[in-house]
Amino acid sequence: MKLLHGLALVFLLAAASCKADEEITCEENNPFTCSNTDILSSKNFGKDFIFGVASSAYQIEGGRGRGVNVWDGFSHRYPEKAGSDLKNGDTTCESYTRWQKDVDVMGELNATGYRFSFAWSRIIPKGKVSRGVNQGGLDYYHKLIDALLEKNITPFVTLFHWDLPQTLQDEYEGFLDRQIIQDFKDYADLCFKEFGGKVKHWITINQLYTVPTRGYAIGTDAPGRCSPMVDTKHRCYGGNSSTEPYIVAHNQLLAHATVVDLYRTKYKFQKGKIGPVMITRWFLPFDESDPASIEAAERMNQFFHGWYMEPLTKGRYPDIMRQIVGSRLPNFTEEEAELVAGSYDFLGLNYYVTQYAQPKPNPYPSETHTAMMDAGVKLTYDNSRGEFLGPLFVEDKVNGNSYYYPKGIYYVMDYFKTKYGDPLIYVTENGFSTPSSENREQAIADYKRIDYLCSHLCFLRKVIKEKGVNVRGYFAWALGDNYEFCKGFTVRFGLSYVNWEDLDDRNLKESGKWYQRFINGTVKNAVKQDFLRSSLSSQSQKKRFADA
């Protein structure tokens, strides 16, 4: 009789579990409050799925104990470009000395992965290995990695997250010159030799699209190059916005592929994996009934994703880019094409927003032309009916507001699986910012970030289940509040609150507590978002939902 009762109980629990799994519904339309996904948890993704947080060296470490990098040079030369508050990464979370605090926060979250970057100029202050290696930098990263492994947190290390040693920029304009390939290889070789016994997931370059476009086309990011008339305030120190982005992108791909080849040959015995990180977006037709808008959306996909993914899968640039860009687009030699094609074990995909695409004439040649115009596409966050995609993502009175669309992550993952051969994928960034003008209580009561994370995780689970996309991990951006590129300290992205007046004062925000429960698998029967929202808006901000 006891056996029958036991079997019945097991059956009921299994049935309840299946029912709960089936009841998870992703909200398809604005406002994406995630009220129907309160039972979503890590258990819906499989036991080996990695849930972590992410950061980058320049944004959290501070300037102590390293050489000067291009973001130091850029932010001091053009402080207004580094952030409207005129601040920079000289002093931020000071993770170089407070790394244990970061690890403690990750332990509190029960994170199983941490994506962070090495500061090239901390390890090799003058850029080239031949000019000396900083033992203090090596020791710092060893201590951090050892502390992570002690807590069973898997390190994902990015070799280059935009902070190129300034010496290499001064000598030959960094990625604009092929000399960078050997210097990047030497730097990577040192890192593999020094840390490869502990680190099994390597990322070569973060967001291949960003430095060529923002750094060399429009000059809004380091190193800040562009054509004279692209920045009418003449704050670019030189450049050609029509040609340099394609050269930089080409050299990035060759540097990436060279490092992957090094890892696969010289360090194969370490049994790790290596790949690049892509910034992704989804592009919807501005007018779904207009063939020109539909064509513009796909053309944007080719210029945004295909620019890198076609070489990485086929060894050549997309046909549409070759047709439009012409001689401004470099060519791969046969040997280079073979080197680049297939040069990844996994892809890291960063996803934040979706945009509407409509045709726009390409003004080339002109004094104000940039490579970003070659697609002949205008991007907006509202469609032909004046409808916005979703809730506010970033308020920007100068450049215009942006809005987010959780289902976009579903479309992006399916697109990469279908078009690029079903790669192994890690979502290496996904996150939401709030304004730093909020007071402490408001910043900690970040229910909007819970909505953002929860709704995106819901669609990520959905695309894995429905389309069989091979996603093995998700990293929320960011571990804690930090310096944001081009925004300074005017926004907060963290799951943990950082008090800039007392850097040891850090607390999990409500989003951090939610993510903690999500990872633990204890969000079933959690309080509804509406109740959470009203509670967090009240004066009882300090109330903990430990039973949620």
Swiss-Prot record:
GO CC, any one term: vacuole
Recorded catalytic activity of this chain's protein: a thioglucoside + H2O = a sugar + a thiol
Q: Which SUPFAM superfamilies match?
A: (Trans)glycosidases
Q: Which GO terms describe its biological process?
A: carbohydrate metabolic process
Glycosylated at which positions? 110, 240, 331, 520
In the UniProt record, the signal sequence range is: 1-20
UniProtKB keywords: Disulfide bond, Glycoprotein, Glycosidase, Hydrolase, Metal-binding, Signal, Vacuole, Zinc
**Entry binding sites for Zn(2+):** 76, 90
Q: Where in the cell is it found?
A: Vacuole
Q: Where does substrate bind?
A: 59, 161, 206, 352, 477, 484-485
**Matching Pfam families, A to Z?**
Glyco_hydro_1
UniProt tissue specificity:
In vacuoles called myrosin grains of a certain class of cells, myrosin cells, distributed in the cotyledons and the axis of the embryo as well as in different organs of the growing plant.
Q: What is its main location?
A: other
Q: Name one GO molecular function term.
A: metal ion binding
- Its EC number is 3.2.1.147
Query: What does the similarity note say?
Result: Belongs to the glycosyl hydrolase 1 family.
The UniProt record's further free-text remark is: It seems that the absence of a catalytic proton donor in plant myrosinases is not impairing the hydrolysis of glucosinolates.
Q: What does this protein do?
A: Degradation of glucosinolates (glucose residue linked by a thioglucoside bound to an amino acid derivative) to glucose, sulfate and any of the products: thiocyanates, isothiocyanates, nitriles, epithionitriles or oxazolidine-2-thiones.
Self-association and partners = Homodimer.
This chain belongs to the protein called Myrosinase
Q: Which organism is it from?
A: Brassica napus
